[in-house]
């Protein structure tokens, strides 16, 4: 009888130890999620229904930072991610002859010039945007940080059909390109064809 009591006590202790271990793991996962969630923020509207064959032109992305070519880097990332999302016809819109962005979002040119080019090239949507932040923070750690806004304009209506804004920062050993890639990927994730 005494052996049965000892076995029951041991079994109870083992269950308690297992439960404590699961609680510790759960707490560690919750803390990790909280830390990662604090690394950025994102806001966006509902995405339109896209077909894999819809042509999307990426307008030159405005660069409101002190980092040279941040807009070009963001546009290249956006084009690659949209293709990876399943859109077959993703194009980079040209700059004009003076080297100026054809779709200068700094001047909020949403007029006929942008839409006329898109119509002439049988584009259904134009993705415009701006880089708000693209740098390494000053200080000992020098964490990378990126901030972007995007607007998807329906060429037929000339109206914004989807928009998103987001920021993301990394740790001191992260690269700016990996932080920017993750941010652009999350922002553009809803822009994928639906079957």
Region annotations inferred by a language model:
Residues 63-66, 96-99, 132-137, 168-171:
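Solvent-exposed loop/turn segments at secondary-structure junctions
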Residues 94, 152-153:
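Hydrophobic beta-strand positions
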Residues 57-60, 126-130, 147-151, 163-165:
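Soluble periplasmic/extracytoplasmic beta-strand elements of cell-envelope proteins
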Residues 52-53, 60, 65-121, 159-163, ...:
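N-terminal segment of the mature soluble domain
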Residues 26, 65-69, 170, 174, ...:
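Charge-dense, low-complexity intrinsically disordered segments
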Residues 1-39:
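Sec-dependent bacterial lipoprotein signal peptides
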């Amino acid at each position: 009888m005494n052996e049965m009591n000892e076995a029951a006590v041991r079994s109870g202790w083992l269950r308690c130890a297992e439960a404590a271990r699961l609680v510790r793991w759960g707490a560690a996962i919750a803390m990790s999620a909280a830390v990662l969630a604090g690394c950025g923020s994102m806001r966006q509207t509902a995405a339109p229904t896209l077909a894999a064959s819809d042509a999307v032109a990426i307008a030159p992305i405005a660069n409101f930072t002190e980092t040279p070519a941040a807009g070009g880097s963001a546009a290249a990332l956006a084009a690659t991610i949209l293709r990876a999302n399943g859109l077959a016809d993703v194009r980079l819109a040209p700059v004009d002859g003076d080297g100026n962005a054809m779709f200068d979002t700094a001047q909020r040119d949403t007029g006929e010039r942008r839409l006329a080019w898109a119509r002439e090239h049988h584009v259904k949507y134009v993705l415009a945007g701006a880089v708000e932040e693209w740098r390494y923070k000053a200080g000992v750690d020098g964490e990378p940080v990126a901030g972007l806004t995007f607007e998807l304009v329906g060429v037929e209506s000339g109206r914004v059909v989807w928009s998103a804004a987001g920021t993301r920062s990394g740790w001191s050993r992260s690269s700016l390109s990996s932080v920017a890639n993750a941010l652009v990927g999350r922002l553009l994730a809803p822009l994928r064809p639906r079957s």
